[in-house]
Amino acid sequence: HKQQHQTYADDRRQIGIHQPPTHYTIICFPHTSIPIGLKDSEISKKMLIFVEILSLKTAAMGNSVKRVLFVNSEIFPYLPESEISNIGRYLPQGIQERKKEIRSFMPRYGCINERKNQLHEVIRLSGMNIIINDVDRPLVIKVASISAARMQVYFIDNEDYFHRKQVYLDENGEFFKDNGERAIFFARGVLETVKKLRWAPDVIHCQGWISHVLPLYLKKAYKDDPIFSNSKIVLSVYDDTPAADFPEDFKDKILF
């Protein structure tokens, strides 16, 4: 198991991802963890336990769960296998197997092979621009399918932010200086795409640091939007963030 875990760690370092996260915490929900190396059926069983908890907790807030939006930093097999990418892969499947509607999003990092994974652009969802720091950048939406799970994954893409081969760290292991802008673009790209889909989620599950700007936008900029008016937020926190700070002007760039 240690040798297998080291292989995953090496794979992740090669494409500029921090060490494999080892802790997983759901804010306001019980602690859970999925060890690497479980068979698909075993992982799905553990996912279903979490789904039960999620459904009960949300029902206690006065809402039944029908639609769950997943905003992921990583999903296997598009990035190397790890705890966080396994959860991005199998948790939506577990929810879907309970007859719930799901939508999954992640960034379209440059290391993802579009031909191998059969990504294609969704023209009707692409075309808008997102302004960050007075600069317009086009939002491109791509989609691929995980056939074994009968599940679609939406990818947020932009040439400036997501076409580099490394994920979060440069070739010297340094945090990209524009990672804050990338997180902003990703969060707003997801929310604007969900609005275009006219798909109102009951629960929005954010996992991985690059998704953590999204709850702030929901509480502030999108708080009066009817698509998100009844959405509950679940935030998963990992130790996947390098010891780096966003630039001082991040707080200005996040405004729009």
Predicted feature residues:
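Intrinsically disordered, low-complexity, charge-rich segments with an acidic bias
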Residues: 1-19
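N-terminal hydrophobic alpha-helix used for membrane targeting or insertion
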Residues: 3, 7-8, 35, 46, ...
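Short, positively charged low-complexity motifs
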Residues: 17, 56, 64-66
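Short, positively charged and aromatic/hydrophobic N-terminal segments
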Residues: 25, 40-42, 46-57
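Catalytic cores of nucleotide-sugar-dependent glycosyltransferases that transfer UDP/GDP/TDP-activated
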Residues: 49, 61-256
